[in-house]
């Protein structure tokens, strides 16, 4: 049974095709479970990718593997830029949901401002057929993306901060 997150679940179940959503909060508060539950109601291809503590290329390769596993890509294709992955996905006829979880891992292992700038470009130009959900646990790093000086400022159609459930809600 899924309890205590009805408001957040309803928000995530909305149609965000062509938009980006951010979900953040402390570790172990239910971000991934909430996202997975919301994805059950989306009747389109979906892919869940947990960022690696590695290079951009490691993460590109990992995302491509998940796209193949989700049968969005028929075979692994070679990409050297995240923007190219999303540009390719944007040419596909079907709408889809792409979840990028543990986004701070990507920022911690690569130039943080560059990663945000890459995702700014993706959100602005390469998700017409995609609902993009970015999630993470490093609250400071996730909040940083919401600040006016950040490349991702104003780019999220919805921002969901998950707090721990109270005893009564759980």
Whereabouts are the PLM-identified features?
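Phosphate-binding site recognition
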Residues: 1-170
